[in-house]
A protein has these predicted regions:
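Stable alpha-helical elements in mature extracytoplasmic
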Residues: 16, 23-24, 58-62, 101-105
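The canonical Cys-X-X-Cys-His
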Residues: 20, 24-35, 105-108
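Sec-exported extracytoplasmic/periplasmic mature domains
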Residues: 25, 29, 54, 67, ...
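Short glycine/proline-rich, acidic loop/turn segments that cap or connect secondary-structure elements
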Residues: 68-84
């Protein structure tokens, strides 16, 4: 019975990791280098996902990324963030995520090495 629970939990966790990887590939690669997904992509001035893991508070930064600049101008979290102000110029397509999506991205980031291979 314990093994079955472990397998189910592990399966859910792996599903979150895979969903987080897909979300990161779709949205985060616009600006960041995200592991092996786009090793030569991203914007030069933005930190890579692996580089961020070197910071002592990396987990908090990923869990709360949507409140840290410049993300509030780009990302809206359903049922958390305010709607985009119509007066604000839309220089990029808004990214709309849920808190479950944020958790999935964090689950994926936890699988990345703290240093580039």
């Amino acid at each position: 019975q314990v093994l079955i629970i472990y397998v189910v939990i592990k399966g859910i966790a792996m599903a979150d990791v895979e969903r987080g990887r897909e979300l990161a590939a779709t949205h985060c690669t616009r600006c960041h280098v995200v592991g092996d997904i786009n090793p030569y992509g991203g914007i030069e001035s933005t930190p890579s996902f692996i580089g961020m893991k070197r910071l002592a508070d990396w987990e908090r930064r990923y869990a709360e990324f949507y409140i840290l600049p410049p993300h509030p101008a780009l990302v809206r979290i359903e049922e958390v963030s305010a709607e985009r102000d119509e007066e604000r110029p839309a220089f990029v397509t808004e990214i709309v995520l849920t808190l479950d999506d944020v958790d999935a991205i964090l689950a994926f980031v936890k699988t990345l090495p703290a240093q580039a291979p």
